[in-house]
């Protein structure tokens, strides 16, 4: 238990920040899940790219707010766009085989 006035305030502040950070983390993780779900459901190229851009923006915001480290943000974006690019290549391959 905190004894001093400043220690009590630190507890309040850290709890508030923990909840805010958790909200940012949940937000960008859900954006990533939306992209993955769109890929698994075979959504059109435009939809997947738009969702990927929104996920990228959410990750960048979390990095700028200090919720996650910039290297972790870069790694998450890289893995996300690797999946997106593989999906887009498979769509292009499917289009060429149909023609």
UniProtKB/Swiss-Prot annotation:
Single GO biological process annotation from the record: translation
A Pfam family the protein falls into: Ribosomal_S20p
Disulfide cysteine pairs (residue numbers): none
SUPFAM superfamilies assigned to the protein according to its UniProt record, in alphabetical order: Ribosomal protein S20
Keywords per UniProt: Ribonucleoprotein, Ribosomal protein, RNA-binding, rRNA-binding
One GO location term (cellular component): small ribosomal subunit
Source domain of life: Bacteria
Alphabetized GO MF terms: small ribosomal subunit rRNA binding; structural constituent of ribosome
UniProt key word RNA-binding: yes
Keyword RNA-binding in annotation: yes
Role: Binds directly to 16S ribosomal RNA.
HAMAP family: Ribosomal_bS20
Family, per entry: Belongs to the bacterial ribosomal protein bS20 family.
Protein known as: Small ribosomal subunit protein bS20
Gene name per UniProt: rpsT
